């Protein structure tokens, strides 16, 4: 995956600085542990960060996840994780964004945080005339009843980790091996299937711009990756 352009991604007004890190292609586990370490170590002086990544194939079960919603995982690993929500799939061709934000600094609550992420996704899809919507009680973004983006977050001491996944140009077959987000028979779709671009960079740029606008951030690309080592 190509690196994000070096120019800062700005909101429409002067905003709070946040480090933007493009992790490329990574397994889920090391990134998850790195998010935990970052969140545990941060304090009120720590700058916010936004991480973008494509994961190797994996099913993740959130805190509300039920094993029976994993129908036939086959050769794809299943991980129990500490985010909210139920079961979802991550894989190549899916854009995953982890906003590591201090909600107290942004002066917003958890509900507003979720709504702003959903609105950023809706605004991004509108760039390609894809009409999307949110659903009460079912976080994420939907197009014509099919889910195109999933949300699963965790808030610790007022700071967020985990985040969103957007199906861009990917093999959707693994979603048939689960009840996505705990809903039997829930249909899923992708940006490409709805007439949008297949290129990850085009989608990434617009989504980051929308997220920066929603949260009032100035995203400053950082070349260094977080420590992705797993604990012994």
UniProtKB/Swiss-Prot annotation:
MF terms (GO), sorted A to Z: lipoyl(octanoyl) transferase activity
Catalysed reactions, semicolon-separated: octanoyl-[ACP] + L-lysyl-[protein] = N(6)-octanoyl-L-lysyl-[protein] + holo-[ACP] + H(+)
Keywords from the UniProt entry: Acyltransferase, Cytoplasm, Transferase
Main location: cytoplasm
Keyword Transport assigned: no
EC identifiers of the protein: 2.3.1.181
UniProt-annotated binding residues for substrate: 83-90, 150-152, 163-165
Cellular localization per UniProt: Cytoplasm
GO biological process, alphabetically ordered: protein modification process
BPL/LPL catalytic domain: residues covered: 44-219
Family (UniProt): Belongs to the LipB family.
Function: Catalyzes the transfer of endogenously produced octanoic acid from octanoyl-acyl-carrier-protein onto the lipoyl domains of lipoate-dependent enzymes. Lipoyl-ACP can also act as a substrate although octanoyl-ACP is likely to be the physiological substrate.
Name under which the protein is recorded: Octanoyltransferase
Organism: Xanthomonas oryzae pv. oryzae (strain KACC10331 / KXO85)
Gene for this chain: lipB
